[in-house]
């Protein structure tokens, strides 16, 4: 049985405060949240104080040069994100039942999703359903997982170290990674390069090349090549990592199929080793608790059909 104060809470709460609080957490500060929302800092501070008074809990620890969320604040943020995700679905859900398929599909993806199969699927769906719109957010794999968990994305495309228990994942495609250097690197014009010659070379890295990260096999490739410990440059973006490799900041790993055009253009050269290269899965991630709109249902059905109709071998790029 609900307590009296629990029954009053949703009626006493100014729901706009939840949106403000969510932005404060995501922007990691009151000043940045104020800029994002187009409001003044005192307005944001007052809203946060009102929300803390309403909930009866401190939500943000505010100290000079420090921003942290309390345990209560973390719980509230997760709930706010799910509420925001549900509300953001309403326009698409209200389109259900229209004679012509309408709605909006929100995609959360990592930066290095390069797949002819996915591109063909997207083209075919967009051509068949011209009234459906799309928005894509590019983020690290961890953030992609969070967006799908919080119901803020129709689905996600990302790397996974392990499949989250509350989500469903299917392999969209697989890709091999190799080491590359750019035209400004001393080894680029050398006729033949041995594995021993790249030992001790500086390198650039994806942020997820860690022991608990989804690109740990790539970190093992760097260790196998005995590159210099640590990295000289790091990024979560394939495009920025490629830029650093081409600019000669260091040797780095890229998906083989993503590097082909640059190899042909003389911007990249693959380095040893050439055998037993790491194979990494890119997943289609969905939330079984999400109430799908008609557009999302049809699109995800097309995704699963494409996965079923093409063998994993055919979806393995090298």
Where is each model-derived feature located?
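Flexible hinge/capping segments at coil-to-helix
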Residues: 168-204
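Alpha-helical linker/hinge and terminal dimerization helices associated
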Residues: 54-55, 76-98, 303, 310-313
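Hydrophobic hinge/microswitch elements
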Residues: 140-145, 149-153, 158-159, 209, ...
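Secondary-structure junction motif
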Residues: 201-226, 292-294, 300, 310-317
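Short helix-boundary/capping micro-motifs
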Residues: 22-40
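A late-sequence structural motif
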Residues: 117, 269-313, 317
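A short LG(V/I)-centered, amphipathic sequence patch enriched
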Residues: 52-71
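Central regulatory/effector-binding core of bacterial HTH transcription factors
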Residues: 102-165, 318
